Amino acid sequence: MSDRLDNQRVVRAPRGPEITCKSWLSEAPLRMLMNNLDPEVAEKPEELVVYGGIGRAARNWQCYDQIVAALKRLEDDETLLVQSGKAVGVFKTHRDAPRVLIANSNLVPHWATWETFHALDRAGLMMYGQMTAGSWIYIGSQGIVQGTYETFVEAGRRHYGGSLAGRWILTGGLGGMGGAQPLAATMAGASMLAVECQPSRIEARLRTGYLDRQTADLDQALAWIAEAGAPGAKPVSVGLLGNAAEVFPELVKRGVRPDLVTDQTSAHDPLNGYLPAGWSLERWERGRERAPAEVIAAAKASMATQVRAMLAFHAQGIPTVDYGNNIRQRALEEGVSDAFAFPGFVPAYIRPLFCRGIGPFRWAALSGDPEDIYRTDAKVKELIPDDPHLHTWLDMARERIHFQGLPSRICWVGLGDRHRLGLAFNAMVASGELKAPVVIGRDHLDSGSVASPNRETEAMRDGSDAVSDWPLLNALLNTAGGATWVSLHHGGGVGMGFSQHAGMVIVCDGSEDAARRIGRVLWNDPATGVMRHADAGYDDAIACAREKGLDLPFLG
């Protein structure tokens, strides 16, 4: 669609205390929408693509302009409705209602396929919102760094006596999500070999400090990895220009043994996200326009080849995990009957955190001043003094993570801490300690906000993997509680037909009204995750629910 391409337009969120909307409650979503399209943040801002293949912030540039205009005239007792990246209505509500309600990429289940989506997308009736692209709370690769770091650290505990020092990880994909992997690996003490087919993505990760080195030579890459494995050597992350469907099997053939194997290519989208083996980027780009069925068939066959290599590593006893891009499902569809022999990362490493409502809590400084983030970092340490792992993360993040767009931070905290931090940040705005309001949000990948049987809800204890009532309830409760904007999406992470998920963002503007909303929303949101896992029979979640005094009738 030509109305999606504008090479002349550069979008950047305003900074500072002056606003162009009628209040911070509408200025905040305006700035975060614009921040999603900042060239420092977005993968292809000229096409409105933020990350994740074709995850967009708005349906087309006309729709973007209409959203911006609607936000600038929005009153504090009105709510803007956004349907798959298009502003479709402004309605009278009340001051504590969300200023924006967003629904992206949702399809009736029988029609929830990429084929149906692409037809609607080509007709200009829909866009793919991914998770935080269409919900306007993407913060660049930092948004996934800590979750990836936590996963790698837990893998070290589980498989290697507590540490990944001297070990190395093999992966594919350095896009908006996958680009977090190299930095997360070296933070966790491991080296990484990351295979990426697009030079621009490797260069972007080098530029932002997420990646240490690049090469197109596999032997050179392996030599660097070997050097970093020597006693006393520092871990290194290497971006290898190549195709994972070719490199992974070659490593198996050579008898190379990584210490952990995973993948974050955009396999969720076989048309736009995965380069078929043997194809050039130019052939791939032409094929997507002229012969999409051929591209999809070739991509899925290549995914099957990569998964067979991952299964070979798994059979050798090497820890191997799916990192949530649905590559196992694609391989299964191509006849790899044992594609699910290795687990997803959530049941393997993350679910115990979800049982306590712990997940990706993120915030951004609307002032644009990094000092506001550093002050909030200090506040987190002050309010959670007895978590050395969290403190280590915050110290490493300040030292090693480059801000992309508006300064922001992510840290994994849970029920009981999120609302305390939110209230503290709001008080810092009120006192003038922060130069402008902050927004608090999260990934849709959280404990109570997603149904995704091949990722977040894989292998639930009670078999409820595919029950999607939970993210709907999460969105409804956050709307009732007064989040500033709430989103409900389909297909994020794993593609059409495989997930439903909800997001929320709340503004800390220093007001007493904001404090009341924050107290409700940032308690209720993680509490739904504890509720969901308690209902599934997880003892840790049941204990957490009782400890926190949650009123869950099924517990008696």
Swiss-Prot record:
Give the co-factor note.
Answer: Binds 1 NAD(+) per subunit.
What is annotated as the active site? 411
One example of the protein's molecular function in GO is: urocanate hydratase activity
Q: Which Gene3D superfamilies match?
A: Urocanase like domains, Urocanase superfamily
InterPro entries in UniProt:
Urocanase, Urocanase-like, Urocanase_C, Urocanase_central_sf, Urocanase_CS, Urocanase_N, Urocanase_Rossmann-like, Urocanase_sf
Q: What class of enzyme is it?
A: lyase
According to the record, the segments passing through the membrane are none
For whether the record's keyword set contains rRNA processing, the answer is no
Q: What is its EC number?
A: 4.2.1.49
Q: What is its pathway?
A: Amino-acid degradation; L-histidine degradation into L-glutamate; N-formimidoyl-L-glutamate from L-histidine: step 2/3
What is the catalytic activity of this protein?
4-imidazolone-5-propanoate = trans-urocanate + H2O
Q: Which cofactor does it need?
A: NAD(+)
Task: Kindly list the GO CC terms recorded for this protein.
Answer: cytoplasm
Q: What is one Gene Ontology biological process annotated in the Swiss-Prot or TrEMBL record?
A: L-histidine catabolic process to glutamate and formamide
Location of this chain's protein in the cell? Cytoplasm
Q: Which residues bind NAD(+)?
A: 52-53, 130, 176-178, 196, 201, 243-244, 264-268, 274-275, 323, 493
Task: Relate the protein's function as given in its record.
Answer: Catalyzes the conversion of urocanate to 4-imidazolone-5-propionate.
Q: Which family does it belong to?
A: Belongs to the urocanase family.
- The name this protein goes by in its record: Urocanate hydratase
